[in-house]
Amino acid sequence: MVEVERVRYSDTLEREKIRAMIKARKEKQKEQSFENEKAVCPECGSRNLVHDYERAELVCGDCGLVIDADFVDEGPEWRAFDHDQRMKRSRVGAPMTYTIHDKGLSTMIDWRNRDSYGKSISSKNRAQLYRLRKWQRRIRVSNATERNLAFALSELDRMASALGLPRTVRETAAVVYRKAVDKNLIRGRSIEGVAAAALYAACRQCSVPRTLDEIEEVSRVSRKEIGRTYRFISRELALKLMPTSPIDYVPRFCSGLNLKGEVQSKSVEILRQASEKELTSGRGPTGVAAAAIYIASILCGERRTQREVADVAGVTEVTIRNRYKELAEELDIEIIL
């Protein structure tokens, strides 16, 4: 009996030692990665550091000094040269995302009737597999909250795709909507309205501005409802949203007008000067941005008409005329029409 207890005690000690070694190794790797981010070459002071994964070394790209050695590569042990090879060899799923109601952590039964070895499923088992696949789809959305999220997030994805918004905006919008659901802000409001308001808030947070009119075009609710819901959720969730800058609209408007980088740079310069003199305060950012682009296109010899600029910016020609006259007068810009 005593001998058995000794064996158990020694096994426990051995396990604790292994855990301590693993923990120490992880901490060391974290420290090394943190140091590597801040590291500079002690020989020449360069920050151009290159990870040589074949030799497991951290090397200065300028003078060739080996700064660190024997670091562990935590990536996969296999290599893939195209998408098909990557899909075949990968043993994990897609990363977690807030744009799916279950954050992408649930499983699904593939529609290709094949087993893990790639062999075709027998016809005798296909009926059972069909039933399993059907019930697996059902249990992914099991209650009212999940159904709400599934519908709202699909709406967010549809609107974001129609507006050509990047992945970061979609993730931010999904997080805003989830917070609204957690605080029970959806009650008494349409799912489409809250989703559109969350997308508008995410655009402002990520400095990828879209106007309420643009959001209205791709949503199924009115501009008035989007604005009202946006003000409500931004107040209740205490969202920190800075006023939209006209500069944020310049790249998109210039791209829509097929203008060169010189015009874009000149437009940004005009807007910065206008901001310093507080000429942008109390005015719509799209109108000011459109006026700056109109002036810059004339100065750089790539003239666009007021109608063309107005169509891309979603404002009227009168707005552009008023704003460009103000900018030209206050900034002493001579425009030859």
Swiss-Prot record:
This protein's GO cellular component annotations are: transcription preinitiation complex
A GO molecular function term, named singly, is: TBP-class protein binding
The residue spans of each sequence repeat are: 154-237, 248-329
- SUPFAM superfamilies (alphabetical): Cyclin-like (SSF47954), Zinc beta-ribbon (SSF57783)
Q: Does the keyword Lipid biosynthesis apply?
A: no
Classification via SMART domains = CYCLIN
List of residues binding Zn(2+) = 41, 44, 60, 63
Q: Which keywords annotate this record?
A: Metal-binding, Repeat, Transcription, Transcription regulation, Zinc, Zinc-finger
Positions of TFIIB-type zinc fingers: 37-68
One annotated GO biological process = DNA-templated transcription initiation
Q: Which Pfam families match?
A: TFIIB, Zn_Ribbon_TF
Q: Which domain of life does the protein's organism represent? A: Archaea
Q: What does this protein do?
A: Stabilizes TBP binding to an archaeal box-A promoter. Also responsible for recruiting RNA polymerase II to the pre-initiation complex (DNA-TBP-TFIIB).
Q: Which family does it belong to?
A: Belongs to the TFIIB family.
The record's listing under HAMAP family reads: TF2B_arch (MF_00383)
Q: What name does UniProt use for this protein?
A: Transcription initiation factor IIB
Q: Which organism was this protein described from? A: Methanosarcina acetivorans (strain ATCC 35395 / DSM 2834 / JCM 12185 / C2A)
Gene symbol here is tfb
